[in-house]
């Protein structure tokens, strides 16, 4: 164990046995990540919780009584915060969450293990929502291939799918938040969001690793919803 340039103790993991270098580096990063440690102390399910906390503290998306949809919810960090801030724990708001993976129960959160790409997923989600939503948020990430251009297109495609769903279920004035990555492949997506929402911005919370191109697109003030049919 050694100190880094900030004076914090830095845990180093030895490579041995069947452990690959990539696994060693991932484990070492997790052990030395202050947000991972803080999440454990605070009782949150993931470090991603702090990303939503920072974004919502600044832009005030989540308010008591709201209905929120959390796409790609597992392990549940965002759903925890959303349920608390909209009052779902007390039955005043609603949080609907889906993910390909299982997710442990969270008070005030209705969860379904669903593939968002599945043809019947939007209809099932609408049934769970039972009306229109105030916020649709997505922390989904596409599987990577290692080919940069292909990965960028996959990521943008996933955000486009989430944005399309948001356009179908959001109330006028609603908000859409989605994880994306810095690239030149999202110009068309951003143009569409700017037509559909009053304000569109990119945000990079402090909890996003600085060596990552990860960022979030936040669109607020949804302009549609009045004429769209909700099945």
Curated annotation (Swiss-Prot):
Catalysed reaction, written as an equation: uridine(2552) in 23S rRNA + S-adenosyl-L-methionine = 2'-O-methyluridine(2552) in 23S rRNA + S-adenosyl-L-homocysteine + H(+)
Active site (catalytic residues): 179 (proton acceptor)
Residue sites binding S-adenosyl-L-methionine per the record: 76, 78, 99, 115, 139
The organism's place on the tree of life at top rank: Bacteria
A GO term for molecular function: rRNA (uridine-2'-O-)-methyltransferase activity
Keyword annotations of the record: Cytoplasm, Methyltransferase, rRNA processing, S-adenosyl-L-methionine, Transferase
Gene Ontology CC, one term: cytoplasm
Family annotation (InterPro entries): RNA_methyltr_RlmE, RNA_MeTrfase_FtsJ_dom, rRNA-MeTfrase_E, SAM-dependent_MTases_sf
Aminoacyl-tRNA synthetase keyword on record: no
Tagged with keyword DNA-binding: no
Cell compartment(s), UniProt: Cytoplasm
Predominant place of localization: cytoplasm
EC number assigned by the record: 2.1.1.166
Class of the enzyme per the UniProt entry, highest EC level: transferase
Function: Specifically methylates the uridine in position 2552 of 23S rRNA at the 2'-O position of the ribose in the fully assembled 50S ribosomal subunit.
Entry similarity comment: Belongs to the class I-like SAM-binding methyltransferase superfamily. RNA methyltransferase RlmE family.
Protein's UniProt name: Ribosomal RNA large subunit methyltransferase E
Lineage: Bacteria, Pseudomonadati, Pseudomonadota, Alphaproteobacteria, Hyphomicrobiales
